A protein has these predicted regions:
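Short hydrophobic "helix-edge" motifs at membrane interfaces and signal-peptide entry regions
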Residues: 1-2, 171
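N-terminal helix-turn-helix DNA-binding core of bacterial DNA-binding proteins
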Residues: 2-39, 70
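Feature captures hydrophobic
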Residues: 38-80, 84-223
Length: 223
């Protein structure tokens, strides 16, 4: 789809996805790329440069780091309502997924950004996630760790080597449906599609930490 507006400005096919990542808190190139696994690094770099040229994004030095950061300009910030409306439309009108193209790593990257850090205990917590029911090509990526040190939350793909405080075992499709608001977490736990184990207090409080997708509350037709 050709770019609209100013030449090489905002491209309707990709830039809303990039802006979504920036609104979600990603600032560095690799963070943005991690949230957009189907976009090549070359294409992402080209679109970020185009957004800079259009006055939507600024590339700035990151204090104390060799890596640059991407920040929304005042003009870019005004896209927030547009991005939210597009996301709500997609949640309401696009067909439900069939479970064949689920990406556990992408799901966990989004979960990592949607934990209520203000509700977490003031201590370091390690949560291990084990997913089952993965599509064949993703079966190697079935275990993830979240390190919670409020207000920071880090996602690990390798065992951090520390004692696990809370263990989450879940069917991937069920967890994704919970994330999207299609299935209640309490129902998934009752049906044993999601199981929690570990420190009793953490098991009890985990449901209150999981904020779900920004669009989980959007009703679907006939829903």
């Amino acid at each position: 789809m050709p770019c609209g507006g100013r030449e090489r400005g905002v491209c309707p096919s990709l830039d809303p996805l990039i802006l979504r990542e920036l609104f979600a808190g990603s600032t560095r190139f690799n963070e943005i790329k991690r949230g957009l696994p189907l976009i090549s690094k070359t294409t992402l770099a080209q679109r970020l440069r185009a957004l800079e040229d259009a006055g939507v994004v600024d590339c700035v030095d990151s204090p104390g780091s060799a890596y640059a950061e991407y920040r929304l300009t005042t003009a870019g910030a005004e896209f927030q309502s547009v991005i939210h409306a597009l996301g709500a439309w997609g949640q309401r009108w696009t067909s439900r997924f069939d479970g064949k193209n689920l990406d556990a790593e992408l799901l966990m990257w989004n979960v990592r950004r949607r934990l209520a850090t203000d509700r977490l205990p003031a201590k370091r917590i390690l949560i291990r996630f084990d997913f089952f029911g993965l599509p064949p090509r993703y079966r190697k990526a079935r275990v993830f760790w979240l390190i919670l040190e409020p207000p920071e939350v880090d996602l690990c793909l390798k065992d951090p080597g520390a004692e696990v405080d809370l263990h989450v075992s879940a069917d991937l499709e069920t967890f994704a449906r919970v994330w999207l608001g299609d299935v209640a977490l309490a129902d998934a736990m009752q049906n044993k599609r999601i199981q929690l184990s570990g420190q009793r207090e953490l098991v009890r409080r985990f449901p209150s930490w999981l904020l779900l997708s920004h669009f989980a509350g959007v009703e679907r037709p006939g829903g």
